[in-house]
UniProtKB/Swiss-Prot annotation:
It comes from Streptomyces fradiae (Streptomyces roseoflavus). The keyword Cell wall biogenesis/degradation does not apply. The keyword S-adenosyl-L-methionine applies. This is Demethylmacrocin O-methyltransferase. InterPro entries: MycE_N, SAM-dependent_MTases_sf. Optimum pH is 7.8-8.5. O-methyltransferase that catalyzes the conversion of demethylmacrocin to macrocin, the penultimate step of tylosin antibiotic biosynthesis. Also able to mediate the conversion of demethyllactenocin to lactenocin. Keywords: Antibiotic biosynthesis, Methyltransferase, S-adenosyl-L-methionine, Transferase. Pfam families: MycE_N.
Amino acid sequence: MAVQKEATLVRQIIRAAGGHAADVRELVAEHGPEAVTAVLVDEIVSRAPHPVNDVPVLVELAVRSGDALVPRRLAVAQGAPVRRAAPDDDGFVAMRVEYELDELVRELFGPCRERAAGTRGTTLFPYATSGTGHIDTYFLAAQQATATVLAGCTSAKPDLNELTSRYLTPKWGSLHWFTPHYDRHFREYRNEEVRVLEIGIGGYQHPEWGGGSLRMWKHFFHRGLIYGLDIEDKSHAEEQRITTVVGDQNDPGCLTELAARYGPFDIVIDDGSHINEHVRTSFHALFPHVRPGGLYVIEDLWTAYWPGFGGDSDPGKSDLTSLGLVKSLVDSLQHQELPEDSGRSPGYADRHVVGLHVYHNLAFIEKGVNSEGGIPGWIPRDFDALVAASSGGAA
Ligand SMILES: C[S@@+](CC[C@H](N)C(=O)[O-])C[C@H]1O[C@@H](n2cnc3c(N)ncnc32)[C@H](O)[C@@H]1O
């Protein structure tokens, strides 16, 4: 298993942002406003949508901490992502947005707050400083560019469908229609410091493709750490809060090592090879490393029917397929109801699968403690006997 670099300061910032205001102050005192601001600007740049202003402008983000003011300029123009302006960039500064550092830390990395007003100061600069042009042109550019930057300064819940287009992941809109299901099952984890592992970063053997879904999860889980496993080197997809690992999802040793290093995971998503044997190996190796209350997700169940992926076109012969695994989990969920002489000794999945949601090509498996106890042995296992026992002698 080859491992790429790992984040540290951002993890401390996320932790402090979920705590008391004093925790953020202590962290800033320890690391200094410049270092903390650098992490925040990285995050804002990655969350900001594509600019729409065709007149390029600069937006100054001024971050205040006590007497210190850390100004950072962002270049905003249609056709390129928002980026940090070069020190010698003498473009037109259209707007200054000023935040208190602790406020911005909590806005970006704290539990989500819907309040949008009263969190920042703004200064709209006169268009005349740009030298030429008409006031309407610059006013519009300033407005659009500021809106773009401010959209990166929030942790409000994004629209997953929109994020699939922005970050280029095929989880919605062409082959797959997964995002509404993801939104339904993942939204309750958004305010948590989740660790999400996705098997399959994307792009297969292309050296620069892939990483779209990791970026989407990074944006959606604004307090999360995102890990991607791929058989190919996908280190180009690394960024703040995204770690990539090279390894084979069909190698239990590799998966155990990965989980020991980065787990337990709140969510694991299998979007890797979709070879049936691999899907089963990964589930058995990684499900024990999902924390109670977490989710294990399997995409692309269609390969269960295709021999080219080790599947079988006969649904009755699913013993070795991904769908066979999913179907077997229904029995795991209900195992406490089996007759005592069934000969089944409860396995790990029996003891820990507490919910199963199956959609077209997609399954969500809920982890927990599956020991509510079966229907007691003294309850009749025969309909007529049950009616008689339940009718107070009237039957
Ligand atoms: C469908 S793509 C992943 C797409 C990505 N999750 C997204 O939504 O944008 C599948 C990826 O799985 C990787 N893969 C194939 N076999 C694998 C294996 N045995 N172990 C780990 N990754 C594998 C491929 O290299 C490819 O990049």
